[in-house]
Amino acid sequence: MKAQNNSIYDVIISGAGPVGLFLACELALAKCSVLILEKAEDPHSLLKQLPFGIRGLSAPTIEALYRRGLLKQLEIHKHLKNSHQNAKQGAQRQVGHFAGIPFIEGNVDTSQWRYRLPGSTETSLISEMQELETVLARRAEALTVEIIRGLAITGFHQTVDGVTVQSGDQLFKSRWLVGCDGARSVVRKTGCFEFAGTEPEFTGYSAKVDIADPEKLSPGRNVTERGMYLQSQPGYLA
């Protein structure tokens, strides 16, 4: 027999990553009752910490965090070099990249961004997955978002007026269900949502290794006869 939670939430979110947590905060600000179900029991993981957990934040993300007063709670970017910015100022300043192709400030037409508010924040920052999740989880809990860890969504059934979500032998009800559970999303697969896009051309792996004479490797992006490597920080290679 399945155990049923008698509460009916406005929204259930699958996944307590940065996207799920930020969405939960926004919904809570709109007075919605929110439940997050996260399959991992422990939010702390070596894969979320430096060096594996290093992440780049784009301009819209930085601005969203700034507007909610969360940007000042991030500390790691103050101690790491942003490899996607150069020392130049003004029109020649690098403000980002796309697959390694640099964006120079003087070549960016900001008038094309119809829905972007002008501001003084950086266009890119380096952060860490665990730091970002910690800041967002703290805010979500302050907004009375309920987070249950160690419960993965295993299925759901949609009705005219809501969704019944299954997690093992437990049932939860909500008016809406949102899948923020990654590339292998159970919500997407169960709901038969299309995952449009192109097939990958290569697979990347993360590993911690000892390299002889690491000082011989140049910083930044480097193209060689045998391929390309990126050294974003001393000892951080891709």
Question: Where in this protein do the model-derived segments appear?
Answer:
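Glycine-rich FAD pyrophosphate-binding loop
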Residues: 28-53
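Conserved structural-core and active-site-/substrate-pathway-adjacent residues in large, well-folded domains
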Residues: 13, 24, 65, 133-136, ...
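A short, Lys/Arg-enriched amphipathic alpha-helix followed by its capping loop at the start of a domain
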Residues: 23-32, 64, 143
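Conserved FAD-binding catalytic core of PHBH/FMO-like flavoproteins
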Residues: 180-238
